[in-house]
């Protein structure tokens, strides 16, 4: 069993996996990695299951020390990672020798990086997951929902093989003003015609009021003209429109029910793109059919099963 010592951390450095399923009828949210795609690639680089437990590093501020020679993998945002001061780019596995320090400083591209270990980090399973949800006091290194703090030791039991790097053409690009695909919801027809036009033809800015529960989008006020709603279950990526007309995209740590009307829901791949956007950046929404969203998702999952890695001898 190998160990990593947390030397420094922030409240935004969390243990995550795919999240909790089959428990929302109990009022327990899903949790899980905000950018599931980058988590899956980080795990793939080590031959792990796609949902093996990883460290989600948001905006930087994490440093870890290897207690023994090890092989780890990094995917997602470029948070200016270094090993003993030497730059380390994402989308690759790498060796970390005993006593060396891996540090994440500040976002150069994207917002969230994912650090994987062979077979995944070991942590208590709470309702089938180790994902950290602070509000519900679930998951994390001790099972009670806290983030990583200095002095924590994380363990893993797997063994890595050859160092690998994800082919450039498969690496997600965290571009400016990304397109977010939306599967339209049941209340879409109850918005005004102007609001329907504005939703998909306007630039939206990410508000600073953003966390793992949701992200508010700033732009033209959308007007709902339908009858008041009874609260209902909320899927991951739902786009709620409160009375002020500014949409809120609900994320992994969202509440389980809500009564605001919804434009629809982001596709899983759109959610991964949104998770890498910073407050103040722009996005735009575009409608997609459920059929089209499913085809896009299946195509990605096929690439995940049989990508073209580059072996590395360094």
Enumerate the predicted regions with their spans.
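Conserved "landmark" site that anchors the functional core of diverse proteins
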Residues: 1-310
């Amino acid at each position: 069993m190998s160990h990593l010592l947390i030397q420094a951390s922030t409240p935004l450095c969390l243990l995550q996996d795919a999240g909790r399923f089959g428990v929302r009828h109990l009022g327990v949210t899903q949790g899980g990695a905000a950018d599931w795609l980058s988590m899956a690639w980080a795990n793939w680089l080590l031959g792990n299951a796609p949902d093996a437990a990883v460290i989600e590093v948001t905006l930087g501020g994490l440093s870890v020390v290897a207690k023994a020679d090890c092989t780890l993998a990094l995917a997602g945002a470029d948070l200016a990672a270094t090993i003993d001061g030497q730059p380390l780019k994402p989308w690759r596995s790498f060796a970390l020798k005993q006593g060396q320090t891996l540090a994440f400083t500040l976002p150069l591209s994207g917002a969230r990086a994912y650090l994987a270990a062979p077979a995944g980090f070991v942590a208590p399973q709470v309702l089938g997951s180790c994902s950290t949800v602070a509000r519900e006091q679930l998951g994390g290194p001790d099972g009670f929902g806290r983030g990583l703090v200095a002095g924590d030791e994380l363990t893993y039991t797997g063994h890595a093989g050859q160092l690998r790097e994800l082919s450039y053409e498969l690496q997600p690009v965290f571009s400016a003003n990304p397109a977010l695909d939306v599967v339209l919801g049941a209340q879409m027809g109850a918005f005004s015609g102007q609001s329907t036009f504005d939703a998909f033809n306007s630039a939206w800015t990410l508000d600073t009021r953003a966390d793992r529960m949701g992200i508010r989008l700033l732009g033209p006020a959308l007007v709902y003209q339908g009858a008041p709603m009874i609260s209902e279950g909320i899927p991951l990526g739902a786009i709620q429109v409160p009375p002020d007309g500014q949409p809120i995209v609900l994320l992994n740590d969202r509440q389980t029910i809500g009564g605001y009307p919804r434009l629809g829901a982001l596709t899983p791949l759109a959610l991964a793109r949104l998770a890498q956007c910073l407050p103040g950046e722009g996005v735009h929404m575009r409608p997609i059919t459920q059929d089209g969203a499913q085809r896009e998702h299946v195509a990605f999952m096929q690439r995940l099963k049989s990508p073209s890695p580059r072996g590395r001898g360094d």
